[in-house]
């Protein structure tokens, strides 16, 4: 009897050892030439070394050229795991609207939103504000790239949702897509979402012109910290259901403070410089 128990125990031990060896073998086989199957369409699994290298390279590249949206997107994905994107997903799961968004999986594109209809809405609505902001900045909701480097399929959708809602954040704050405006909005987003890429983007402020730096540090960074911390979790806003609402009412509900109009500020500075230059020429 004792011998039989010993044999069975050894058999169980051997099976456990085989499973452990198989798991280690799979881990060793995960390489550039032998990747696991993707978890969703477009998914590219990465090893920890690949993820780190891609994060560093993309961060440096986006710092040198803040207009490289593809690099910024890559930094966002490679630095969001393992903690930050799960925190954002959990914030959605803890909110009734957030849970509906995760269940419905809406997408924000020119096919899902009728821009001509939004342009026809009253001027005080969220939809009109969003559509006219797109027109003024010359951008489209179709420019957001698909998530590739986040392994969890649900978390990948959360990142995609954040990415596609970004222009709504621009619209309700009024910030333009010039580098100065993007950095200000990223600082606001970091305080609201804690996505590392949004915080890292603030370092791009070192490349601003002196007068732009002064504005950022004195006006827009304090605004971003104050408003980003005070506002509700924006990832839980079902923007598609807010299009006909009064934009000021929504700002108040979300506790979003609108910053000074950056385009007006830049325009006035240009006019002052032009007037000063003309005065010098006349004298």
Swiss-Prot record:
Signal peptide: none annotated. One of its GO terms (biological process) is ubiquinone biosynthetic process. It is a peripheral membrane protein. Keywords: Lyase, Membrane, Metal-binding, Mitochondrion, Mitochondrion inner membrane, Transit peptide, Ubiquinone biosynthesis, Zinc. InterPro entries: Coq4, Coq4_euk. Its main location: mitochondrion. It holds the Pfam family Coq4. Zn(2+) binds at residues 166-167, 170, 182. Its cofactor is Zn(2+). It catalyses: a 4-hydroxy-3-methoxy-5-(all-trans-polyprenyl)benzoate + H(+) = a 2-methoxy-6-(all-trans-polyprenyl)phenol + CO2. The keyword Nucleus does not apply. It is an enzyme of class 4 (lyase). It is found in: Mitochondrion inner membrane. Residues 1-25 form a transit peptide. One of its GO terms (cellular component) is extrinsic component of mitochondrial inner membrane. PANTHER family: UBIQUINONE BIOSYNTHESIS PROTEIN (PTHR12922), UBIQUINONE BIOSYNTHESIS PROTEIN COQ4 HOMOLOG, MITOCHONDRIAL (PTHR12922:SF7). Lyase that catalyzes the C1-decarboxylation of 4-hydroxy-3-methoxy-5-(all-trans-polyprenyl)benzoic acid into 2-methoxy-6-(all-trans-polyprenyl)phenol during ubiquinone biosynthesis. Component of a multi-subunit COQ enzyme complex, composed of at least COQ3, COQ4, COQ5, COQ6, COQ7 and COQ9. Belongs to the COQ4 family. This is Ubiquinone biosynthesis protein COQ4, mitochondrial.
